[in-house]
Amino acid sequence: METVQLRNPPRRQLKKLDEDSLTKQPEEVFDVLEKLGEGSYGSVYKAIHKETGQIVAIKQVPVESDLQEIIKEISIMQQCDSPHVVKYYGSYFKNTDLWIVMEYCGAGSVSDIIRLRNKTLTEDEIATILQSTLKGLEYLHFMRKIHRDIKAGNILLNTEGQAKLADFGVAGQLTDTMAKRNTVIGTPFWMAPEVIQEIGYNCVADIWSLGITAIEMAEGKPPYADIHPMRAIFMIPTNPPPTFRKPELWSDNFTDFVKQCLVKSPEQRATATQLLQHPFVKSAKGVSILRDLINEAMDVKLKRQESQQREVDQDDEENSEEDEMDSGTMVRAVGDEMGTVRVASTMTDGANTMIEHDDTLPSQLGTMVINTEDEEEEGTMKRRDETMQPAKPSFLEYFEQKEKENQINSFGKSVPGPLKNSSDWKIPQDGDYEFLKSWTVEDLQKRLLALDPMMEQEIEEIRQKYQSKRQPILDAIEAKKRRQQNF
């Protein structure tokens, strides 16, 4: 019965979830069909809206902190209405997960398509995708929003070949405001120099990222992808703008387009509106030229799913036979919680969206920067000394934290010193421990003994900080449950 429903067109188009739907449990409004993939921020599922029959994508994100900020950013998403931007329908709070209901793009991301086909895109294909992407950026920038996470993994295609921007602000803000996972390091490969340097940035930061994305689509990965992210942090602001590995393979128009995007000075960088008039984009062909590569990618995906399903069925049979021989009772092996197969990848590039692969370089860098009405006369450029300064990039926070931890650990193990009060101890700057040579053994031993109370004090401070963040979330969960019970 469900199969028949899926084959029929939607009874009416879903524009957004009404208040009645939002007060229900999400399982009453949607049938979850299968798991599409995972990102650093959570899992993505394909689902069907029961009332309209429309297919949607649902991101299930574990919420661990700053719930009010997340809700505020999601409400801003409702302002966006463009055919070149993935639509946001609404959100639910269930247990400790946030369910974000968004438009489903059946072909997946551009990076998914490159990975599945195991080949890069042609200039014609790139031009068509860039044209739609620029229209999406023009809309966002007109709305005075900065995406800050433009890359092939965040450009989705529907089955007709229409490109749409995804994860603008929602996933970016979620990953910025949630508790960070130690295994995740934001990659700076797509980021504009001014964003890395934190010297102030505006909408054209997205244009730099678009130029990097153009190279990514042409060559399969962004510049500097083969080096450590920490090294790239310093190379992007200091080195000349990156270019193609083999410039002779590409047309003058394409080369010039990328050059216009990758101008290090934000003031001299082209805008989305200007780039829509560039010869490379103006000569772009219709979306129909993307249908062949979409069909090819979807065929590969289907064959992999069928192959993996056969393997799962075979494993189930073998496990069942073993169980029957051991106990005389047939026991069917338990599958995953959704009863579906997750597709593995042959290539990884750090894409982080509605994906069918594991990320080796997941991105935490997307952040929507919203300007209030009071700031309109001042423009969108943000400086460090302003009240609403840009959030520190996640990768910088990560590396700074690791550096502090390394300094504390190495100092605590081998170089303690004699201070009467443990609170007076300062971490030596620039690894300068020469002064320890003048201390006596007794002084060094006193310093060592003082470390344990310091550690206990720091642990208690961390516990109190965690509790202060945890309690509002628990209160919000309880309030949400009471509200649902009232209906």
From Swiss-Prot:
Residue ranges that the Swiss-Prot or TrEMBL entry lists as coiled coil: 290-310
GO MF annotation, one: metal ion binding
Modified-residue entries (Phosphotyrosine), positions: Y433
InterPro entries: Kinase-like_dom_sf, Mst1_2_SARAH_domain, p53_tetramer_sf, Prot_kinase_dom, Protein_kinase_ATP_BS, SARAH_dom, STE20/SPS1-PAK
PROSITE patterns linked to this entry: PROTEIN_KINASE_ATP, PROTEIN_KINASE_DOM, SARAH
Location of the region described as Disordered in the Swiss-Prot/TrEMBL record: 303-332
Regulation: Inhibited by the C-terminal non-catalytic region. Activated by caspase-cleavage. Full activation also requires homodimerization and autophosphorylation of Thr-183. Activated by RASSF1 which acts by preventing its dephosphorylation.
Residues the record lists as Phosphoserine modifications: S265, S320, S410, S414
PTM (free text): Autophosphorylated on serine and threonine residues. Phosphorylation at Thr-387 by PKB/AKT1, leads to inhibition of its: kinase activity, nuclear translocation and autophosphorylation at Thr-183. It also diminishes its cleavage by caspases and its ability to phosphorylate FOXO3. Proteolytically cleaved by caspase-3 during apoptosis at Asp-326 and Asp-349 resulting in a 37 kDa or a 39 kDa subunit respectively. The 39 kDa subunit is further cleaved into the 37 kDa form. Proteolytic cleavage results in kinase activation and nuclear translocation of the truncated form (MST1/N). It is less likely that cleavage at Asp-349 is a prerequisite for activation as this site is not conserved in the murine ortholog.
Compartments reported by the entry: Cytoplasm; Nucleus
Sequence ranges of Acidic residues compositional bias: 313-326
Biological-process GO terms, alphabetical: apoptotic process; hippo signaling; protein tetramerization
Stretches with biased composition (Basic and acidic residues): 303-312
Active site residues per record: D149 (proton acceptor)
EC code: 2.7.11.1
Site positions for Cleavage: D326, S327, D349, G350
Cross-referenced SMART domains: S_TKc
Binding annotation for ATP: L36, G37, E38, G39, S40, Y41, G42, S43, V44, K59
Keywords from the named record: Acetylation, Apoptosis, ATP-binding, Coiled coil, Cytoplasm, Kinase, Magnesium, Metal-binding, Nucleotide-binding, Nucleus, Phosphoprotein, Serine/threonine-protein kinase, Transferase
Entry-annotated residues carrying N-acetylmethionine: M1
The protein's assembly and partners: Homodimer; mediated via the coiled-coil region. Interacts with NORE1, which inhibits autoactivation. Interacts with and stabilizes SAV1. Interacts with RASSF1. Interacts with FOXO3. Interacts with RASSF2 (via SARAH domain). Interacts with AR, PKB/AKT1, TNNI3 and SIRT1. Interacts with DLG5 (via PDZ domain 3). Interacts with MARK3 and SCRIB in the presence of DLG5.
PANTHER family: STERILE20-LIKE KINASE, ISOFORM B, STERILE20-LIKE KINASE, ISOFORM B-RELATED
Similarity-based family: Belongs to the protein kinase superfamily. STE Ser/Thr protein kinase family. STE20 subfamily.
Free-text function comment from the UniProt entry: Stress-activated, pro-apoptotic kinase which, following caspase-cleavage, enters the nucleus and induces chromatin condensation followed by internucleosomal DNA fragmentation. Key component of the Hippo signaling pathway which plays a pivotal role in organ size control and tumor suppression by restricting proliferation and promoting apoptosis.
Protein name: Serine/threonine-protein kinase 4
Organism: Papio anubis (Olive baboon)
